[in-house]
Amino acid sequence: MVQSHFKGVIPALVTPFRDGEVDEKAFVALVERQIAGGVHGLVPVGTTGETSTLSHEEHRRVVELCVKTTAGRVPVIAGAGSNSTDEAIELARHAKTVGADACLVVTPYYNRPSQEGMYQHYKAINDAVELPIFVYNVPGRTGVDISNDTLERLAKLPNIVGIKDATGDLTRISFQRLMCGPEWVMLSGDDPTALGYMAHGGHGVISVTSNVAPDACSAFMNACMQGEWEKGLYWQDRLVRLHKALFLDSSPAPTKFAMAQLGLCTEDVRLPITACAEGVRPAILEAMREAGLR
């Protein structure tokens, strides 16, 4: 079953920079730290990985490096989103070529296609690349919201296997579970509501917070997957302020600030994202302390 392969806590990895370039040494160390922390998969070059400000060459290199470093220990779901269908196909083909286990394709942004346009976008990728494809729905960033009716149609295609749902709307998951069938993989894209998402039948979370706290995020998700809700609630209470603190400024700047405090990478981000504002740093540090990180 696809669900047995893609589940649990799956960090949306940051892309570390140093002196304006991708810091490959730091990236490899981040991958190793996540795997040692017990995560169940990895997502390179997603939103948190600043894919929109990576060159195509950098994007491809980060995917290759993630696959090589992971060496099959956990599945790699490579970011392959674009508002150009042809470009998304190209990125998905590259992900398959270098050995990624799946790709994550955000709904087309800026050009704001209709529901039929989104269906045809994903169908074209499905037809072009034999690789598991996750739909990524994040209307707060893209300006479009893929409907459950469209997802039901997409679920009938052989390579469209599931969704990363970053809407935070927990009512959607029950309908998706009923409409898309038992093989449909449902991954939350919202750390703060992941507990509820799992209780509604979800299979995991593509997590920002795991960049900072992989051990705690893994413990939380293991509890949820085992139906140990009291234990899951313990970890939820310990992590919830950190979940929120990592979005007190434009992401991933707060996450990189937190990681820099742990000596994991620099704070460097690429414009138009700027370094985490001084005014929110104390709240991030306090949330880290509450999560047992300082």
Swiss-Prot record:
Q: Which SUPFAM superfamilies match?
A: Aldolase
Catalytic residue list? Y136 (proton donor/acceptor), K164 (schiff-base intermediate with substrate)
Which terms are listed as keywords in the entry? Answer: Amino-acid biosynthesis, Cytoplasm, Diaminopimelate biosynthesis, Lyase, Lysine biosynthesis, Schiff base
Q: Could you tell me which CDD domains the record lists for this protein?
A: DHDPS
Q: Where in the cell is it found?
A: Cytoplasm
Q: What class of enzyme is it?
A: lyase
Name the domain of life this protein comes from.
Answer: Bacteria
For molecular function, the Gene Ontology terms on record are: 4-hydroxy-tetrahydrodipicolinate synthase activity
- Gene Ontology CC terms, in alphabetical order: cytosol
Q: Give me the residues that bind pyruvate, please.
A: T48, I206
Query: Does the record bear Endoplasmic reticulum in its keywords?
Result: no
Catalyses which reaction(s):
L-aspartate 4-semialdehyde + pyruvate = (2S,4S)-4-hydroxy-2,3,4,5-tetrahydrodipicolinate + H2O + H(+)
The family assignment reads: Belongs to the DapA family.
What exactly does this protein do? Answer: Catalyzes the condensation of (S)-aspartate-beta-semialdehyde [(S)-ASA] and pyruvate to 4-hydroxy-tetrahydrodipicolinate (HTPA).
Q: How does it assemble?
A: Homotetramer; dimer of dimers.
NCBIfam families to which the protein is assigned, alphabetical: dapA (TIGR00674)
Name used for this protein in its record: 4-hydroxy-tetrahydrodipicolinate synthase
- UniProt source species: Caulobacter vibrioides (strain ATCC 19089 / CIP 103742 / CB 15) (Caulobacter crescentus)
